[in-house]
Swiss-Prot record:
Positions of the CheB-type methylesterase domain: 156-348
Protein name, as recorded: Protein-glutamate methylesterase/protein-glutamine glutaminase 2
Disulphide bridges: none
Entry function: Involved in chemotaxis. Part of a chemotaxis signal transduction system that modulates chemotaxis in response to various stimuli. Catalyzes the demethylation of specific methylglutamate residues introduced into the chemoreceptors (methyl-accepting chemotaxis proteins or MCP) by CheR. Also mediates the irreversible deamidation of specific glutamine residues to glutamic acid.
Keywords: Chemotaxis, Cytoplasm, Hydrolase, Phosphoprotein
First-listed, main subcellular location of the protein, grouped into a coarse class: cytoplasm
Length: 351
């Protein structure tokens, strides 16, 4: 069965470009191209697409309004096409909160290599979206519990442990849900979420507003502090190194690892090497296998490993690969994951 795709974009150039890319893939079937939300609504009813690529900025009815109506009337897998601006990034995260599966920046095709890389990426995202769990099909997010109901962590744990998290498709909302359940006082948290440049700073700012923790985009060479969360910048690997008695960040422009930059494997490998048994790591929703090798090293070094359960994942790819390797100690659905991680940290020897 081919995957039926509807392209919705007010730019004829983008519509035709995406249409040609989709038509060139035998696994996909282009069922229509719409220039605005009104045309799109008719085509959704007529063709019942499996996946919709949706421009955020459209005339008459904008992409967010259309997405909200679509998710209420006929939930469908949607990949947002987003502009590389601060406003575009904000709108993208609002779209993901409304139920969009994934997003991709608008193409900047300055060379044949750019075209080929963009084509590979958009086709991969469309195929992944077709097999994703929609918001209505996933385990409900946890209700945020007040800090007084959370187990207290000892000063030793807060100052010696390191929490590492990796995610891809569906990860922005999963990370938000997880961090919202953490208390304000935590060991340093480092996160790699697959995301292009131009979006990670806005993502960090969003998390900073919506959680009790201090969240920021990681900078090179900064000391990791308790109560802070550090997000890997787009197109840069985030590593943790130990300098003296302190954990510090290192950002690099190395080759893609497991197909990604930033890579979860790069982060997890570095944390395993410098924090060892003082590592608590979680691998969340995402396609592919990035993070499985790193989880194996964390397990080998004596760290504690968690994976998000299938029922709450948008795409159960990265967790599945790590679980298959036999290196995950606890498989937990997202609503219960924060409590499981906190209970483990609270159980460690007190000072």
């Amino acid at each position: 069965m081919t995957i039926k795709v509807l392209v919705v974009d007010d730019s004829a150039l983008i519509r035709n470009l995406l249409g040609k890319m989709i038509e060139a893939d035998s696994e996909l079937s282009l069922v229509g191209m719409a220039a605005d939300a009104y045309m799109a609504k008719d085509m959704v009813n007529q063709h019942r697409p499996d996946v919709i690529t949706l421009d955020i900025e459209m005339p008459k009815v904008d992409g967010l309004t259309f997405l909200d109506r679509l998710m209420k009337a006929r939930p469908t897998a949607v990949v947002m096409i987003s502009s590389l601006t601060e406003e575009g990034a904000d709108a993208t995260f609002n779209a993901l909160a409304l139920g969009a599966v994934d997003f991709i920046p608008k193409p900047k095709l300055d060379s044949p290599q750019d075209f080929n890389e963009y084509q590979d990426l958009i086709l991969e995202k469309i195929k992944s979206a077709a097999h994703a769990k929609l918001k209505t099909q996933r385990a409900a997010p946890a209700v945020v519990v007040q800090p007084s109901h959370k187990p207290a962590l000892s000063n030793r744990v807060i100052n010696t442990q390191l929490v590492a998290i990796g995610a891809s498709t569906g990860g922005t909302e999963a990370i938000l849900s997880l961090l919202q359940q953490f208390p304000a006082v935590m060991p340093p948290i480092v996160i790699t979420q697959h995301m292009p440049p131009g979006f990670t700073r806005t993502f960090a700012e969003r998390l900073n507003k919506l959680t009790r923790l201090n969240v920021k985009q990681a900078e090179d060479g900064e000391r990791l502090l308790p109560c802070y969360v550090y997000i890997a910048p787009g197109d840069q690997h985030l590593e943790v190194i130990k300098v003296g008695g302190s954990f510090k960040t290192r950002l690099t422009q190395g080759d893609k690892v497991s197909g990604h930059r930033p890579s979860v494997d790069v982060l997890f490998n570095s944390v395993a090497e410098c924090a060892g048994a003082n590592t608590t790591a979680a691998i969340l929703t995402g396609m592919g296998k990035d993070g499985a090798d790193g989880m194996a090293l964390i397990d080998e070094q004596g760290g504690k490993t968690f994976a998000q359960g299938e029922q709450s994942c948008v795409v159960f790819g990265m967790p599945r690969e790590a679980i298959k390797r036999g290196v995950i100690h606890h498989v937990v659905e997202l609503p219960q994951l924060a409590d499981k991680m906190l209970n483990y940290l609270a159980s460690l020897k007190r000072d």
